[in-house]
């Protein structure tokens, strides 16, 4: 039995097979255990002799089992290490990494410029009411200024639009044509003084070409308080120009009409590298009728008027135009064309 058992133990291929051999010989119903149980039937002298033989066999089997178990464990460990070994000389697996969209990069840069000047960045809804997009901004129905904006009007029932304080807003709905509605929303919910910028996406129903898109981005600015003048507006635009184009940049203001500001101006920045004036956006002093519309809306909500005796300025500029200048992009349609080769150029740009 001993020779047979030792040979079987030595040839065991894995720990499961070794466990089965241990049970076969040393288990409760094992061969050696049964032999030892039969010792009681033997005469005393023969029992003593046979008991010594069986104990020696048991010790030999236990030693062989322990040695084989250790050998199998070492072999399994070696195999696992070999299987999991990493060849550090092999080239690493390349991982796909994304990057920020150039519009996001430009928008973040603009917001950070104004945050350094004490402005707070806020956002408004893209689905807007006719009141906030037009009426409250001194662009009533049938006003000729509405022809300046080609609008996406929304049809259908069941959409609830919330106002600045969570109230339900009635009237026709549209995709906002500019970020200016957030001026009114913010003024309804807050009292001056304050400085805010409003980055966001806007929509115009117009034909697309290299410089025009139906969907684009604007950055709106609004400052309201006592004694705010055109000089403060010019100072803010000068700071923007120097942050974007360097300390040698110059700013030019030209009079222009916008219904929600009076006086209104269009501002351009001298671009030293390009050697030309770049029209960036429009600005002006907030029209008194806008303040009146805000106070009237506040009173309907049971709030006291807050915009009598204050002044403010507002400005707006196109994010795409600045991004095209910053990154040398010739066609605005590249931004939303979905071409990976174009977008991958901006990996790592912060």
From Swiss-Prot:
A Gene Ontology molecular function term of the record: phenylalanine-tRNA ligase activity
GO annotation terms (biological process): phenylalanyl-tRNA aminoacylation
Catalytic reactions on record: tRNA(Phe) + L-phenylalanine + ATP = L-phenylalanyl-tRNA(Phe) + AMP + diphosphate + H(+)
One family name in Pfam for this protein: Phe_tRNA-synt_N
Gene3D superfamilies, alphabetized: Bira Bifunctional Protein, Domain 2 (3.30.930.10)
Cofactor(s) needed: Mg(2+)
Annotated binding of Mg(2+), by residue: 262
GO cellular component: cytoplasm
Main localization category: cytoplasm
Listed EC numbers: 6.1.1.20
Cofactor binding note from Swiss-Prot or TrEMBL: Binds 2 magnesium ions per tetramer.
Main enzyme class: ligase
Keyword Lipid metabolism: no
Compartment(s) of residence: Cytoplasm
Keyword list, A-Z: Aminoacyl-tRNA synthetase, ATP-binding, Cytoplasm, Ligase, Magnesium, Metal-binding, Nucleotide-binding, Protein biosynthesis
Protein family: Belongs to the class-II aminoacyl-tRNA synthetase family. Phe-tRNA synthetase alpha subunit type 1 subfamily.
Quaternary context: Tetramer of two alpha and two beta subunits.
Name assigned to this protein: Phenylalanine--tRNA ligase alpha subunit
Species of origin: Thermus thermophilus (strain ATCC BAA-163 / DSM 7039 / HB27)
């Amino acid at each position: 039995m001993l020779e047979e058992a030792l040979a079987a133990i030595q040839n065991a291929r894995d720990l499961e097979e070794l466990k089965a051999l241990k049970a076969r010989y040393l288990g409760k119903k094992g061969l050696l255990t049964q032999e030892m149980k039969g010792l009681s039937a033997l005469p005393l002298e023969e029992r003593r002799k046979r008991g010594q033989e069986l104990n020696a066999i048991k010790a030999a089997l236990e030693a062989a089992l322990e040695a084989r178990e250790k050998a199998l464990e070492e072999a399994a460990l070696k195999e696992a290490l070999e299987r999991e070994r990493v060849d550090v000389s092999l080239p690493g697996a390349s991982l796909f990494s994304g990057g920020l969209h150039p519009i996001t990069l430009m928008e973040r840069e603009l917001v950070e410029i104004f945050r350094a000047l004490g402005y707070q960045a806020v956002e408004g809804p893209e689905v807007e009411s006719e009141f906030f997009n037009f009426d409250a901004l001194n662009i009533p129905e049938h006003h000729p200024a509405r022809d300046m904006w080609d609008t996406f009007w929304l049809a259908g029932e069941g959409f609830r639009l919330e106002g600045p304080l969570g109230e339900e807003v009635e009237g026709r709905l549209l995709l906002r044509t500019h970020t200016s509605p957030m001026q009114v929303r913010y003024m309804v919910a807050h009292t001056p003084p304050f400085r805010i910028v409003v980055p966001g996406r806007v929509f115009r129903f117009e034909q697309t070409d290299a410089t025009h898109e139906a969907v684009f981005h604007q950055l709106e600015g609004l400052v309201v308080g006592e004694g705010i003048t055109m000089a403060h507006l010019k100072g803010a635009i000068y700071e923007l120009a120097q942050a974007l184009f360097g300390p040698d940049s110059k700013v030019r203001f030209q009079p222009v009409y916008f219904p929600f500001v009076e006086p209104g101006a269009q501002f351009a920045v001298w671009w030293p590298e390009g050697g030309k004036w770049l029209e960036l956006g429009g600005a002006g002093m907030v029209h008194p009728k806008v303040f009146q519309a805000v106070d009237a809306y506040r009173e309907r909500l049971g709030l006291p008027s807050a915009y009598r005796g204050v002044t403010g300025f507002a400005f707006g500029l196109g994010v795409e135009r600045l991004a095209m200048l910053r990154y040398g992009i010739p066609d605005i349609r590249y931004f939303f064309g979905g071409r990976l080769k174009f977008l991958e150029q901006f990996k790592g740009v912060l």
